[in-house]
Every structure is written in C-alpha cells, then in structure tokens.
C-alpha cells in the first residue's frame, strides 16, 4: 500500500495551496476531492465544446503574492485587468467604485465620496494591524510561545503608534457590526449595502450580527495587482486560474 506524509481533504484552492506547500517541502501528499475536477470555487465548467464558464468565483481579490510565487503562477494569471465594483439602484444611477476598493467613486455626491474614502482609509489601516496574523500558526491554548507573544507585542506597538484616539477607535470598531459602521460613516444606502455584502459574503452572519465587521477587515487584508482591496479578472477568467492551481 502506498503511504503518504499528508492527506489533504478537499481540492479547492486552499487545499491545493496547502498540498503544493507540503510538496515543495519534500512531503508526499495525497489530495482527496469528491468532485471529478479539482479547483473548488475556481473550477470552471464547459457548457459547449470550446466554451467554458467560471464557477462560483468570478473575480480575484485575495491572491497572496507568496502563494502566486509558490505555485509559479504566470503574470497573466497572478494579475490582470482591474475591474470596478458597480452598485445598482432602481432609483438613481449606479455607484461605481474604481481602482482599489473605491479610491475613485462615480455616481455619488462629492461629500459621500469623501465619507467613503475616510471609512476606506480607516478600515485599510486597521486591517493592516490584523494582517500580520494571517500567516502565523494559531498559538496552542495551553502553551503560548515567545514568538506568539512577540507577534502580539508588535501588533500592540503598531496600534500605539497610531495614536491614542485611533487606537481606541480600532478597539471600539473591532467587535461592532458592519451595519452600525455604515450608518456612522455613510448616508448613501448603496455604499452601506456594498460594505455589508463584502463583510458577510461566505460567513453565517448578518450585517447586524456582532463582529460582522471582521469580514470586511479580512477582505481588506488582501491585495490584487499590488493594491490593497483591489480586484481583477485574470486572462482566461477565474477558471483558468483554477486550472493553474492544479
């Protein structure tokens, strides 16, 4: 019987990345996937010979540069054409957020655009404090090591360097719900709906659930094309990126 050093259950993009990292480290890895084709949300489906549609994932907004390097992804898949976010309404023209999560906004008043940029800059700055923990192994509950304490200490120092007022604001917002944050900073229901959607996509929380803002922090810890909060469509669509993961 063939033996393996590691068995990864699930051939989605996370499972495939884990398998690739283990394999590069010299481990013999088996990936188990229930579907006949690996890729998970990145998996595309052919609906006619010569034509392929994307699966659940339509855009890329959290492709870690280290993962792209690990998988040796070509430039046309690791980056691509920046795509805007369009928020539709049946009463007014659409709000269009361009560049990295609304650096430029069309379809809203100047005052509202300024309010959104203030919120955007605040959230990106705060998400940067949490970002340092994403690639760390969670500490064991019974034996927190020196490196874990050092990571917490560096996060605390980064928070202190932002000043007392910003530090208090971060600690206040950290456990809040995204709906209250939207009401606090914004007046346009389209933009409120956008941040609520991004904060709760893929999680079992509603916009008024406590801690739902954490989902938006997570969204803004990622980057695309070198820009925090950006999003793009790779050449050939997301399905082409999924094939590269395999």
Where are these regions (language model features)?
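Active-site/ligand-binding neighborhood in enzyme catalytic cores
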Residues: 124-246
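N-terminal glycine-rich phosphate/pyrophosphate-binding loop and immediately adjacent elements
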Residues: 2-144
């Amino acid at each position: 019987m063939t033996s393996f050093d590691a068995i990864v259950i699930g051939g989605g993009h996370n499972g495939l990345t884990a398998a690739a990292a283990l394999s590069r480290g010299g481990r013999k890895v088996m990936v188990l996937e229930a579907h006949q084709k690996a890729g998970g949300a990145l998996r595309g489906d052919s609906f006619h010979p010569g034509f392929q549609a994307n699966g659940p994932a339509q855009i890329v907004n959290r492709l870690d540069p280290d993962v792209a390097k690990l998988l040796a992804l070509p430039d046309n898949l690791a980056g691509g054409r920046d795509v805007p976010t369009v928020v539709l309404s049946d009463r007014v023209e659409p709000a269009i957020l361009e560049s990295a999560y609304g650096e430029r906004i069309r379809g809203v008043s100047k005052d509202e655009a300024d309010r959104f940029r203030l919120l955007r800059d605040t959230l990106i700055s705060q998400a940067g404090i949490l970002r340092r923990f994403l690639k760390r192994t969670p500490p064991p509950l019974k034996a927190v090591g020196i490196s874990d304490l050092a990571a917490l200490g560096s996060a605390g120092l980064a928070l202190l360097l932002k000043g007392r007022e910003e530090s208090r604001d971060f600690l206040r917002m950290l456990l809040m719900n995204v709906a209250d944050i939207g009401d606090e900073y914004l007046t346009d229901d389209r933009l409120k709906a956008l941040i609520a959607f991004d904060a709760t996509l893929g999680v079992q929380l509603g916009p008024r659930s406590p801690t739902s803002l954490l989902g938006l922090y997570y969204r803004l810890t990622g980057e695309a094309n070198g820009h925090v909060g950006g999003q793009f469509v790779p050449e050939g669509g997301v399905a082409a990126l999924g094939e590269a993961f395999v």
